[in-house]
A protein has these predicted regions:
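C-terminal alpha-helical "lid/dimerization" subdomain adjacent to the S-adenosyl-L-methionine
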Residues: 421-430, 453-509
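Well-ordered, non-membrane alpha-helical segments in soluble/globular domains
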Residues: 194, 238, 287, 318, ...
């Protein structure tokens, strides 16, 4: 397989990690059969008939539409209808249950370790997959295409958590990647681990000779992209609870009984995965930063505020870029660069402070809420005598992840252009409200970004009809599921830009970037003023 085909496999794996739990859960609840028996079904009809959480059921149905099993229509009423692929998929749905059981069983163990009990549960699945006996035989060529798609789902659920564990635990160190090795060199239970390596050998990731394993070129391709799986796999604690999400008490899925600890996502894994995924877009940000800090000194911002600074890596990177590659870098003695890391999470602030000190970078670290810029500006002025408006404001993949606030204006809104599925704690949110909430959120920031603007990297949804035509060419399905079920609000790129305009702000086209630059665009960089 060439690189394009291998990249396509990753996208299909990610599709599977989110879609398989939905298929099994809806099949168990007889919702798939109900859809099969009816031509068109409205969301409200399904939610009422099956006593489902309407908001998350909407997310689930849109995922199935993105995978080509349903047609999904938002206006005039939200409804779905089966496509020609639907009944073929339904024929295989029962056979996917053991995979879902394995996912659920694994959640009782450490997400980032290989333990004996999950291995034992995994072993028969690996064997039946390798023997191609997990799914019934295809009836014809068309049926075989659906079977292949579902086999990728299974493969994704088996491979995804595995490659992330290997990546986070040092398997892709040069020691293993550049020479052959035995199972016992890596794991204290070599017999079980060997079964896993044999499965990966079946997938052509390794060559095996006399119980020695060595990476193939194909295996190296996946190993180097292990972080691509990290964000989606980090949500398996939530996806494994699909029954609760769709039909139960959703608060049990999101937080522990004390209400403090996130239990729907493995945050360390999420950060590890997103770090790898974000690197591509930071290169484009470099170009924009260099341009801004090469302007005459009196036209430059006093510094940068990174909202949602995480571990401080972006601030550290930006400092090095400005110091070494811009006019400002030559005048830091007379025009010091004020770097500010702001985050809602106290642990992130501690890590940022420690990392910046360790790298000999002077920076301010401050608690901040993306939904309350007035307080942030006051604290910044009070503690450091810095005006928020004198800084270039930045954030990466954050605005869609703000805590839901119902918009002040809910009546007389323009009809939404979005085809997204949005919820808060399982409750269905009108798309008009989601757009208006973003408009009002941006308006809060307007007084503080009028001078130098807001440089924002943002994630977007795309129409499920576009996604379904591009299976294997986009990660949109995985993004829609993980964000939809965790109450995050990713709007289409054109809808996002329209919300910016409605807020009274504008987009500087000179600083706009879109990835990819076609109808599949689901990541953008904008300078908003």
């Amino acid at each position: 397989m060439d690189k394009k085909d291998l990249r396509s496999v990753i996208f299909r794996h990610l599709d599977g990690i989110v879609t398989l739990p939905i298929l099994v859960t809806l099949h168990n609840a007889d919702i798939l059969q109900f859809i099969s028996n009816n031509d068109k079904v409205t969301l409200s009809e399904l939610a009422t008939q099956f006593n489902a959480n309407e908001g998350y059921l909407n997310v689930a149905l849109r995922v199935l539409a993105s995978q080509g099993f349903l047609n999904y229509q938002v206006k005039p009423k939200l409804f779905v209808e089966k496509t020609s692929k639907f009944n073929q998929m339904l024929r295989y749905a029962d056979s996917l249950k053991p995979v879902m059981e394995m996912i659920q069983f694994s959640q009782g163990f450490h997400n980032r370790l290989f333990e004996k009990e999950p291995f034992l549960k995994l072993k028969p699945l690996l064997e039946s997959y390798q023997n191609d006996t997990l799914l019934p035989s295809a009836l014809n060529d068309e049926d075989n295409e659906i079977r292949k798609q579902l086999n990728y789902y299974v493969e994704g659920c088996l491979v995804g958590p595995t490659i992330v564990r290997l990546g986070m635990n040092g398997m892709f160190h040069k020691y293993f990647m550049e020479s052959s090795f035995k199972a016992e060199e890596y794991h204290k239970d070599p017999e079980s681990f060997e079964k896993l390596l044999d499965f990966l050998t079946h997938l052509c990731w390794f060559n095996k000779k006399n119980n020695n394993y060595s990476f193939t070129d194909q295996g190296l391709f996946f190993a180097r992209r292990a972080t691509s799986y990290g964000v989606t796999v980090s949500y398996l604690p939530m996806l494994s609870q699909m029954q609760h999400l769709l039909f139960g008490n959703v608060s049990e899925v999101k937080q522990d009984k004390g209400g403090q600890q996130e239990i729907h996502v493995d945050r360390a894994m999420n950060v590890w995965g997103s770090g790898g995924a974000h690197a591509t877009y930071f290169k484009a940000v470099d170009e924009l930063i260099i341009e801004i800090f090469n302007k005459p000194l009196n036209e430059q911002p006093k510094g940068i505020l990174d909202m949602g600074c995480g571990n401080g890596a972006l601030l550290e990177h930006l400092f090095e870029t400005i110091e070494n590659r811009t006019l400002r870098g030559k005048h830091l003695e007379t025009h010091p660069l004020f770097l500010v890391g702001a985050d809602y999470n106290q642990e992130a602030l501690k890590i940022t402070r420690a990392n910046l000190i360790a790298n000999d970078i002077w920076a301010k670290v401050i608690w901040g809420d993306i939904g309350n810029p007035v307080q942030l500006a006051a604290d910044l002025k009070d503690e450091y005598n810095i005006e928020l408006n004198d800084l270039l404001n930045m954030r990466t993949f954050l605005d869609h992840n703000r805590i839901w606030e119902q918009p002040v204006k809910t009546e007389g809104l323009e009809e939404s252009l979005s085809t997204g599925a949005y919820a808060t704690n399982g409750l269905l949110l009108p798309n008009e409200w989601v757009e208006q909430s973003l408009v009002e959120h941006l308006q809060k920031w307007q007084p503080f970004i009028s001078k130098f603007g807001l440089l924002v990297i943002e994630l977007h949804t795309i129409d499920s009809a576009i996604t379904s035509k591009n299976i294997g060419l986009t990660a949109a399905t995985a993004y829609d599921a993980t964000h939809g079920f965790s109450d995050q609000y990713i709007l289409e790129l054109d809808v996002f830009e329209e919300c910016v305009k409605r807020s009274g702000l504008s987009v500087d086209d000179n600083y706009t970037r879109k990835y990819p630059a076609d109808e599949r665009s689901n990541i953008s960089i904008h300078l908003i003023k």
